[in-house]
Amino acid sequence: MHEEIVALRDRMDLVPTVAKWAHEEFWSYAGRTLEQTEVLFTPVPRDTWLPRTFVLMQSETPIGTASIVEHDLDIRPELAPWLASVVVDRAARGRGHSRTLVKFIEDFARDKSVEKLWLFTWSAEGLYAKLGWRAAERLERNGREIVVMNKKLVD
């Protein structure tokens, strides 16, 4: 099957799908509505590169998404930019799609001269560690233990 990664701002028809995935994985626990989550994925003007969301397509079917944002952790405003909202549709999991999306965002950031990228996770530390990300600190956020990780993109 043919796979490609497209910019969400070029495929506005995918916003409801991407927002639903992100809402189910990350935002519903915080009391945010699906409509509020959709607003997070409303594309920004084309003259800026942050934030950006990309969608992994298999033929014409969206199967995953990932974003790069300026800030993703309110208690660490000094850290930027962030890999965020990496989600693969449940039916497509276990096939390396998260890895594909993470590598794409890393390459995108590298092309923008980003030296270090950040993320936080409560459930995928092992995946990111396998991809070369390092744990920087452990915190509690919204009642969950999270790990803040980073990856140096340039030597």
Language-model segments: residues:
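Conserved N-terminal entry element of GNAT/NAT acetyltransferase domains
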Residues: 1-17, 155
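Conserved beta-strand in the GNAT
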Residues: 53-55, 61-71, 82, 87
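Conserved acetyl-CoA pyrophosphate-binding loop and the N-cap/start of the following alpha-helix
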Residues: 92-104
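C-terminal "cap" of GNAT-fold acetyltransferases
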Residues: 115, 119-124, 137-155
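Active-site rim helix/loop that mediates acceptor-substrate recognition in acyltransferases
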Residues: 26-57, 63
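Conserved acetyl-CoA-binding loop of GNAT-fold acetyltransferases
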Residues: 129-139
